[in-house]
Amino acid sequence: MSKFVITCIAHGENLPKETIDQIAKEITESSAKDVSINGTKKLSARATDIFIEVAGSIVQKDLKNKLTNVIDSHNDVDVIVSVDNEYRQAKKLFVFDMDSTLIYQEVIELIAAYAGVEEQVHEITERAMNNELDFKESLRERVKLLQGLQVDTLYDEIKQKLEVTKGVPELCKFLHKKNCKLAVLSGGFIQFAGFIKDQLGLDFCKANLLEVDTDGKLTGKTLGPIVDGQCKSETLLQLCNDYNVPVEASCMVGDGGNDLPAMATAGFGIAWNAKPKVQKAAPCKLNTKSMTDILYILGYTDDEIYNRQ
């Protein structure tokens, strides 16, 4: 038997018992006699765990695919499949994308707006995030459009516009208390990823470096290896090694196609308000408003999250 937990998280203020019962029914019906329900646990008014056992041996990805109809049929509830083992809650490394994940914006689009090339950059970004364009090539195309931009005041102006996603500071604080290492791996730029790292008190950051000429202008190029999907995956493994963390105890959170390799490498992966293709390919999707909801996926209750015990 294989043990799993199905976490149901409502987008609204409440998760009705009728909805939980319906999802449990759909789980058993979609899996014939392979699945048995072993009980539920209320995490909050918005979230509930459904514990199941599956006959035989099956991995998370295959069970998620088997339950695709259940997952996709509830637009106002995220249905997340996790392995019910010690690593579900005992995460020791969380790796985050930056743009549209830790922060609401895409930094390169903010710079593009400053440079008057917003439309061109946005179109390339969309294609890259939907996995329709190689990330390295898309980055080169976008950065090239920024050539000649004076950076003396640009960096400070952009930093002032960055808005941290709701729930991120609280999530980071909670995870740090649980002795979890936190990192940001960004296909964006170190000039801003480093700033976000410092703002949130993260342990590590890696991103691309914009090249600046002797006149203080962007050259339209980056320096060093590009941080793409493969780089994120390899860096996640390196961080596991550096921090002595089992890969099973790691988690990747992101919204773009270039986050998928690291999600597949990590012990678990979360597509945060991601593009449809990314949601489908990722281990799970979370489309709520606050990133503290990730703690429900780990099995924490509101009492534990908000220290009400």
From Swiss-Prot:
Active-site residues from the entry: 97, 99
Record-listed E.C. numbers: 3.1.3.3
Catalyzed reaction equations: O-phospho-L-serine + H2O = L-serine + phosphate; O-phospho-D-serine + H2O = D-serine + phosphate
SUPFAM superfamilies: HAD-like (SSF56784)
Coiled coil: none
Gene3D superfamilies attached to this UniProt entry: HAD superfamily/HAD-like
EC class of the enzyme, as a word: hydrolase
Zinc-finger among keywords: no
Gene Ontology annotations of biological process type: L-serine biosynthetic process
A cellular component annotation (GO) from this entry: nucleus
Superkingdom field: Eukaryota
Ligand binding (Mg(2+)): 97, 99, 255
Further remark: Present with 13800 molecules/cell in log phase SD medium.
Family membership noted in the UniProt record: Belongs to the HAD-like hydrolase superfamily. SerB family.
Protein name as it appears in the record: Phosphoserine phosphatase
